[in-house]
C-alpha cells in the first residue's frame, strides 16, 4: 500500500484543518454548554432557513413542513432582515418582501413553525433564534446563534446564552479568521491554563470553576 504523502494531499489536509479550526462565512458549529443546552452557531452574515432534507443544503435545516429554501436572515451592520421565499409571517402579519426584525419579534414559517428573534445585548450584533413551537434543527439544537463579532454567555438576561449559575461572563470573539475566548478569571482551553484571553478553535473545550462549554465543527 502506497502511503506517500504528496504535496497535493498535504495541501488538502491543511485546508481541511484550517476550515475546521477557524470560522469562515458559511461555516457552522455546535456550541455545547453544560447544564444549559446546545446551540447551532452560524458565522455567515446571510443565513438560509429551510426544510431538513438531505438533497438541500441550508444553514438552518428545520424538521418541519417548510420549503427547501424557505427564508433568509441577513445581517447588515447592526440590523437583521428576513427575506421570505415561502409563506412567512412576522408579528402575525404575512410578508412578501424583506423586513427589518426587532428584538422579540415572533416569526412563523409555513403553517406551524414558530420562532422568536432575539438581539439581547445592546453592544453586540449577535442574534439568537428561539423555538416557540416543538420543531427543531437537524442536528438538534436548543436555539440558533447568528454570531457577529462576539457571543456572550453568562447569568444576565442580556447575554446571548443565559447561564444562571455562572459567576463570570464568558465571551467568544471573532478576530478575522480566528476565535478567542475572554474570561475575567482563570480558565482552561483544551487543558491549557489561561487567564483573561486565549485563542480557541472550532473543536475546543473551555472550562472554569463553574462553567464548561465546547465547540463542535459541523461540515
Where do the PLM segments sit?
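Hydrophobic, helix-prone linear segments
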Residues: 1-48
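N-terminal short leaders/motifs
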Residues: 20-36, 57-64, 110, 121-125
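Short, hydrophobic/proline-enriched secondary-structure or compact coil segments at domain edges
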Residues: 27, 107, 125-133, 180-183, ...
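Short, solvent-exposed loop/edge segments of extracellular or virion-exposed proteins
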Residues: 32-35, 131-139
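Glycine-centered tight beta-turn/hairpin loop motif at sheet-sheet or coil-to-beta transitions
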Residues: 35-37, 110-112, 208-212
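Forkhead-associated
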Residues: 41-104, 141-210
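Short, structured interface segments
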Residues: 102-123
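Short, compositionally biased
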Residues: 116-135, 214-219
